[in-house]
Amino acid sequence: MTILEQMNRFSDRFGKQVVVNNTTWRYYRLGVGAPIFWLPGGLRRAAFGFAFLESLAAHHTVIAPDYPPAQTNDEYITAFDAILQAEGVDCFALGGQSYGGGLAQVYLTHKVKSVERLILASTGPGNYPKAALPALNVFITLARFLPEKTIKRLMTRLLLKLITVPEAERAEWREAIDTLMQNDLSRADIVSHFAVAADRIHKDIVKPAAYQNWTGRAIVLSSENDPTQRKNSIPRYEQLLGRAVTVVNMGDLGHTSAFSNPDKYVEFLEQALV
């Protein structure tokens, strides 16, 4: 089956939804065992991770949402609460990959009594500096006013730069992402991508004081050849979270190892979940 066919199959088998403030939030629940709430990256559709999510579900209950074009972090928090309530989950591991890692750091500020461990994969500290706001505002303006075909093409290029898969599979992944961008995502989704990050800065959500009452563990999964990783990320995480951070080195698997080598990726995740 093609990637898109496998995504559709995954969605049909495990897809569920909740309606929160007149917005439909689709999500997926699969597996048995201790729950992990997994927040996907900037592709905005958890089904892109069908292979690793099904593998992870062999020993864990996995819950992973899609992202509608919400414009604020509060909307995400409210929806995530509704999803977990619908599934009867009170205590859980919280994970996020890339863009989802930033959302995970936000959600943890709201769930310090419920999250036993935070797993951050191929992402960075979410306390973005105020100096990032002008650039984010430029991206938001471009997303709102450029022709939709143009902004979708630019967003596709941005996402493809981070997709690390074997060369033989790259054309199929490009087709899947192009199809998603043209047929599923809207201009509002692209605005949301940047607006939520700007909202995070404006409201000063991610900061050391927000984690003072959290008693859980923090684990970072990082690849040496991931362009989003920085040498100072671990010290910044430790300063932000107020505790030592366990690092799981994924070698040279790149930014999207969940796509390129899902079984190996789950091995690393299992280390973080022990």
Residue ranges and their predicted role:
Residues 253-262:
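Catalytic histidine-centered segment of alpha/beta-hydrolase-like enzymes
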Residues 101-112, 118:
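Short glycine-enriched nucleophile-adjacent loop
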Residues 129-131, 149-211:
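Conserved alpha/beta-hydrolase catalytic His-Asp/Glu region
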Residues 20-71:
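Conserved HGGG/HGGXW glycine-rich cap/lid loop of the alpha/beta-hydrolase fold
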Residues 54, 63-99:
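Active-site loop/oxyanion-hole signature of alpha/beta-hydrolase fold enzymes
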Residues 93, 116-119:
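Residue in the alpha/beta-hydrolase core beta-strand immediately N-terminal to the catalytic nucleophile
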Residues 118-146:
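Flexible "cap/lid" loop of the alpha/beta hydrolase fold
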Residues 53-55, 213-252:
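Conserved loop-alpha-helix segment in the C-terminal half of the alpha/beta-hydrolase fold
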